[in-house]
Amino acid sequence: MNNHYHPTGHRDAKTYAGDRPWPQWPGVPSGLSSSSGLLQNRYYAPAGPFPLLPYFGELGAGPDTAMNQAKRQRAEVSYQQPRPYPTGRGTGSMGYQSKVRVTDKYKVVGFISSGTYGRVYKALGRHGQPGEFAIKKFKPDKEGEQASYTGISQSAVREMALCSELHHPNVIRLVEIILEDKCIFMVFEYAEHDLLQIIHHHTQQPRHPIPPNTIKSIMFQLLNGCQYLHTNWVLHRDLKPANIMVTSSGEVKIGDLGLARLSYKPLHSLYGGDKVVVTIWYRAPELLLGSRHYTPAIDMWALGCIFAELLSLRPIFKGEEAKMDSKKTVPFQRNQMQKIVDIMGLPTKERWPLLTSTTEYSQLSTLQPPIHHGGHHGHHYQSQRQAAAANAGVSHLEKWYYNTINQQTGGSGPGSGTSPLASLGAEGYKLLAGLLEYDPQRRLTAAAALQHPFFSTGDPVSANCFEGLKTEYPHRRVSQDDNDIRTSSLPGTKRSGLPDDSLRPGKRVKEG
């Protein structure tokens, strides 16, 4: 039995066995009306016998009409209120435990990373529970010698609720939740690598591109995981290389659902309570332009940015984030939008009919149209600007793509050069353009992207993104000098061993 995905999107029977029922397409997941679960579908969601997830416009109609008021109210209560998680559901091992000490069940090996949420540690199982695990400890509301406990953060509640219900090979698996001394510990399966680390490895001298079959496998698995989330009405909202885990067997897993939200009510603004979502470099244009009724399309834009980064080994839209003002209002992210315009051209009403309804539409007039640098030498700067203004809406993404995949040969058009990435060809560009479509309603869905010819041409897509590679990627850095999981002090968010500018957006700038 081989280990490849079929063009339909299923893996061989080894993974998508007949004893797992096909996910039922929900008007709204019926499990939302039950106190026992948030999501009806806990099974795999390969591209197959479902209709596409509908993408709603700013005021689109949707599945909300298929669910009566009583069910909606029960769903909201089920989602918003934290509750103990019963054991023995899903995979059979995930549960909520409040009378067990984390160090009794796990031997902490060392510290992996930290962020605004808390810290992540690597651990080994004890007492007949073999294997490696990642333990995420949420920091207390107020830090100090004596932690102050005032409740569970909204982000923690969301992540616990969603992770306890989501079960898919391309989504990181939650093993259990432990509450100890008013601290929450989420125990996840461990992945030896993350996508940021893999990209960084290829930037080391001699710089070498990620092999095309590896890129195909990574993108297919990401899209497969995203389709599962979107089929279950979950928006991830923070897809970026640092949040994509990769196991030693080459299985790609979407992680960090701290910003994820349910999206079954298209008329309900998803903006309230979440001033900013998605790391700036991967933020979709509708978010930058102030859209409040965004859709799963924001995740697809982020996947397009990740695809481009796998090709070029650097973020395609590397802008600087503007600070909030004293009133805590979110400013227009002019610099980031300009980075997008430089490659994609200015958005137009023809390309994006609902563009004028975005709250920051007027700000587009403050942006500079892209200058095409491939013209004849000797042209005056002013004439370049005039030409740019006349073609402000023209995208240069195709030129960027072919320059990138042919970078080792200097070619700039389809089929030129012998770079390893040249085999991705025109279908690679079409997939990238579909993911980086300005109009969220025209942007590729995860299901449609899985059916794209990019994945059915050339070698079969492998379920192991490392298949055939001679490269051995270093494992995630673990600091064994810092393995006290009980400590309350937290370091900065930077992870050692990787360049700062690859971990987070550049220095923030104050917008006038």
UniProtKB/Swiss-Prot annotation:
Regions annotated as coiled coil: none
Enzyme Commission number(s): 2.7.11.22, 2.7.11.23
Record carries keyword Repressor: yes
Residue numbers binding ATP: I112, S113, S114, G115, T116, Y117, G118, R119, V120, K136
GO MF: ATP binding; cyclin-dependent protein serine/threonine kinase activity; metal ion binding; protein serine kinase activity; RNA polymerase II CTD heptapeptide repeat kinase activity
One Gene Ontology term, aspect cellular component: CKM complex
GO BP terms in the entry: negative regulation of filamentous growth; negative regulation of transcription by RNA polymerase II; nuclear-transcribed mRNA catabolic process, non-stop decay; positive regulation of transcription by RNA polymerase II; protein destabilization
Keywords: Activator, ATP-binding, Kinase, Magnesium, Metal-binding, Nucleotide-binding, Nucleus, Repressor, Serine/threonine-protein kinase, Transcription, Transcription regulation, Transferase
Cofactor(s) this protein cannot do without: Mg(2+)
Bias type Basic residues, positions: 373-382
Catalytic residues (positions): D238 (proton acceptor)
Domain Protein kinase: 106-455
Keyword Transmembrane included in the entry's annotation: no
Feature: compositional bias, Basic and acidic residues: 476-485, 497-512
Enzymatic reactions: L-seryl-[protein] + ATP = O-phospho-L-seryl-[protein] + ADP + H(+); L-threonyl-[protein] + ATP = O-phospho-L-threonyl-[protein] + ADP + H(+); [DNA-directed RNA polymerase] + ATP = phospho-[DNA-directed RNA polymerase] + ADP + H(+)
Record region (Disordered): 1-22, 75-94, 368-388, 476-512
The protein's assembly and partners: Component of the SRB8-11 complex, a regulatory module of the Mediator complex.
Family in the record: Belongs to the protein kinase superfamily. CMGC Ser/Thr protein kinase family. CDC2/CDKX subfamily.
Function per UniProt: Component of the SRB8-11 complex. The SRB8-11 complex is a regulatory module of the Mediator complex which is itself involved in regulation of basal and activated RNA polymerase II-dependent transcription. The SRB8-11 complex may be involved in the transcriptional repression of a subset of genes regulated by Mediator. It may inhibit the association of the Mediator complex with RNA polymerase II to form the holoenzyme complex. The SRB8-11 complex phosphorylates the C-terminal domain (CTD) of the largest subunit of RNA polymerase II.
Official protein name in the record: Serine/threonine-protein kinase SSN3
Source organism of this protein record: Chaetomium globosum (strain ATCC 6205 / CBS 148.51 / DSM 1962 / NBRC 6347 / NRRL 1970) (Soil fungus)
Top-level taxonomy: Eukaryota, Fungi, Dikarya, Ascomycota, Pezizomycotina
